[in-house]
Amino acid sequence: MNDTSITLHHSKVTIAPGSVKNPLCVVAHYLFDTLCPAIFQVEQMKLKEGLISVGSKRVEEPDPLDPEIIKRFDNHFKYDEIDDDYYATEDSDAPHFRRILHWYRDHFGSSPTGASILLPIGALRALRRLTAFSDGRCIVISGDKGNNNPEQFRGLMDPHIAEHGSFSV
C-alpha cells in the first residue's frame, strides 16, 4: 500500500509513476474490505476512531500460527475521540479523507442514534498509487461488499468481522 513502484518478479521490470503509457484496468475483487479499513463512529457531532484489539478466546495458544486461531478470535473495540485534523499527516489524500469524515460528522452529528462508518483507506491509497503509474488514467472494476446508502450506517455498533479462511472487516 505504501510502495510507489512495483518490480515484476520474472522480468525484473520496474513499474513506477508515469511509466505506463496506456490506461490501467484494475480488477479489485474484494479489495475494499480487505486492505486496512479505518473504523469511525459519529456521536453528538464528535468523530471517534475505532481501535481493535485481537486476541484468542483461549488463555494460551499452543501454536499462534495455527490457521484455526481465526475461529477463536476475541475482538475488543475501543472508540477514541479525534480532532478535525485527524489525517493531517497524510500525503495528498489528506484533504479528501478529511472532507469525507467531516461530511459524515455533519450528516450524522445531530442524529440521536449516531453512526458507524468503515472507510476503505488502504484500498484508496493503493488505487491512488496504481493510477499514478498511468498518470491518473485508470478504470476500476470492483466486486465487493458494502453499503451505498448512508442511512445504512445509522447506529453505534462494532464492525462485522467476516471469517473465510482469512478475515475481513
Predicted regions and their residues:
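Conserved nucleotide-cofactor-binding alpha/beta core module
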Residues: 1-3
